[in-house]
Amino acid sequence: MTDLDFSSFLQKQFILLGEMHGVRENIEILKMFIEWATQLEEPVVVCLEWPDQLTEEINDYLLGVGLLRWSSWEFIKHKDGRVSQEHIAFLEWLKDFNLHLVKKTTVQCFDVETGGWNERDKKMANILLKRKSERVRVIAIMGNFHAKKEKFFLDQEEHIPLGYYLPTASTTTIKLDYLSGSFFNKSQKEFINRETNDDTELLLKESQDPDYDFVLLIPRAHPVSLLK
């Protein structure tokens, strides 16, 4: 993938990546941000929209003191694209990547089970906000609605997203915007937002939408692979 200019994010503690679940390129983008952030002074915390109780198991695995028992994870049954063969391969990559780092990258899972959308997003935000007083850089990837900075209405109901609760001055929100392709969420689906060609490259630009600070245009999306 094309190298990106990360200079706009140097002073930001919280970097939110708003994804469409079930796209393989999400993981490649996340890896690019990790590779950039680990060159800086602060330790990096990678935050995943996975059940928070998996945090300890995953970090033990990254440190080489535990196994990754993903086949027992209940949430893989949702088949909503948040976890896949590519995500497990990503954790294997992160474990190997960590071997060469003085300050190890850790993972924080932040999904919680609650009654409603707004309550869930507030609780997920609180998990990230616990890191505010720590000298760390947080890279969090989540569904793009959760990464929004502003309240919004959907089906005539007000939604207050995770991104709304984070400190504006130290947070940047980036929407991953795919031009065309396929994704897997319950089933494989195809879409075309805009025409593209083989020469189209990644493009990071300031967002015209007040919900996000930046938009990262991605030429083509490919679906993730189901865990078996």
Model-derived segments and spans:
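Compositional signal for N-terminal targeting/processing segments
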Residues: 1-228
